[in-house]
Amino acid sequence: MIKNTVRIINKNSNTFINIRNNNNNNINSSLKSGFGTIKRFNTTLNHNSSNSNIQTPISINSTIINNNNNSNNNNSNNIINNDLNVVKFSTISTPNSILDTLNENHSNQTNNVNNKNYNNNNNNFEKDDKFGPPNNQNNNKLDLDTSKLYVSKSTGELFFTFMILKVCSINFISDNSQKFLNLFEKLGLSKPLNFFIKYSFFKQFCAGETIRETEIFTEKLNKLGIGTILDYAIEELAGSSEGFDSVAENICETIRVAAKNPTNSFSCVKFTGLVTPSVLEKMNTLVSNVTTNVSELPIESFNSPLDFYLNQSSSLMKQGSEPLLTSKDIKEIKEFFNRMDKIFQLCHQRGVPILVDAEQSYYQVAIHHLTMSYSIKYNKEKPIIYNTYQMYLVNGMNVLKQHFELSSSQKFNFKLGAKIVRGAYMVTESERSQRLSTENPVLPTIQDTHKSYNTALDFLLNQIKSDPNSIGLMIASHNEDSINLGTKLIKQYKIDPTNPNIQFGQLFGMADFLSFNLVDQHQRIFKYVPFGPVEEVLPYLIRRMHENKGFIGSNSDKELFYLKKEIKRRLF
């Protein structure tokens, strides 16, 4: 089947939409421009689309008809609007498979727009790369009943959410958020600033300052059919041993709370919250000196990972090299292992799965090695420990396959826990590679990242199709296309959607319209529920603001659209 596609650019807002027409000459649609404003246009196509042999893009010249309707009526293509231009007309063959549909969807976006979006929206790779509000350009897109979607929220809550997400989309504020914090601290105004943040951004993206405060939200989410991922949201601490011990104890407390409802709860851990980042980087260097492919490491490195790192450091000294690890580093590494032992052993005892967060690539080989070591120990019967795979990395798919082969090998034979994400450190990764004149570990375009993510999703669901208990999968994404792909593949592969080893994950305070749609489809959906003292969670909030800047300009436009729609429905 041939589809005619017209791409429309709104010159005022720099957004575009694709209008698709299945051999129908009349197309009506709308393009959002500002709060509550819909600009309508009518496009009449006289292009002969009956020739099914046409497979390539066709350029056309279009006449823009101004408000006075002065036009050349003999022109074969008339666009009635004063601020819209047709920039592309093409005929597209309908793809044969779901995965082809998703990859074509992404690759058909304008490269210049997407590359700019990919480079500027620094920390957001859980977003869709489409612009504008929901429209009917793709039958897979959502068109939700907002009265049902937001039935649990008051009008005040809806307006509050809209305002916070809108502020996060302002580049000047999000780009300079850390500078504002530093300025207020220099002026001695940290306390009033923290008070303001607590009742604004913190309230939107965090569930409280203590684990007990989060229980109100977890109960509310559970009643709505949504599970929780309890997250002590400390980005990193370069502090004392006591500080790291405190973080470990808070994580253990999340496990104890989650154990009250283990089938509907996760915990999570970020290793730079348990050890000084520079020490973790040294550990990464030690394991990378052997190999960057964790599956190639000797069995002893998994059975006794602490001894492995200490022995690697000793080997360097014997070779006449300067010791990579100081006596202080060795002491800290031993304490780090004690904290990990405590956390993962408690998860295993209580039956609570835990997600190990991904971090920058210069920590990641060590993180992979440590996570696989504990997975081998505790994931024999079911996935308890989940590793995170960043699909925006060049080696993302290779690493995922290597770890799956490791888990299914006879010498280890454990259940792989896999959380797949796009990634969140593009700017720091790119800046570091430029500074060190090394190869950028991040894929060059957003289209490559979309393809990598969707390929990983298909690969993992294929394994679950063959053996429902082989893998634990967390599909962590706010990308509507990837979510649609996941639900379609689950149906196509005839996988039970209630399988406890498959779940979708999204962030608290974001993408509620996607979360509730998954509930309606009887999929298992979990929300990250962060908590912690306001002043310690500020780095997390800044990262959320950066991610929302990109998310607002794309998939979150849809969330704003639904929020506005419901507010207007209630008020007018």
UniProtKB/Swiss-Prot annotation:
Residues 105-124 have a biased composition (Low complexity). One of its GO terms (cellular component) is mitochondrion. Keywords: FAD, Flavoprotein, Mitochondrion, Oxidoreductase, Proline metabolism, Transit peptide. Its cofactor is FAD. Residues 105-140 are annotated as: Disordered. Pathway: Amino-acid degradation; L-proline degradation into L-glutamate; L-glutamate from L-proline: step 1/2. GO terms for biological process: proline catabolic process to glutamate. It is found in: Mitochondrion matrix. Gene3D superfamilies: 3.20.20.220. GO terms for molecular function: FAD binding; proline dehydrogenase activity. It is an enzyme of class 1 (oxidoreductase). Its EC number is 1.5.5.2. It catalyses: L-proline + a quinone = (S)-1-pyrroline-5-carboxylate + a quinol + H(+). InterPro entries: FAD-linked_oxidoreductase-like, Proline_DH_dom, Proline_oxidase. The keyword DNA damage does not apply. The keyword Phosphoprotein does not apply. Its main location: mitochondrion. Converts proline to delta-1-pyrroline-5-carboxylate. PANTHER family: PROLINE DEHYDROGENASE 1, MITOCHONDRIAL, PROLINE OXIDASE. Belongs to the proline oxidase family. This is Proline dehydrogenase 1, mitochondrial. The gene is prodh.
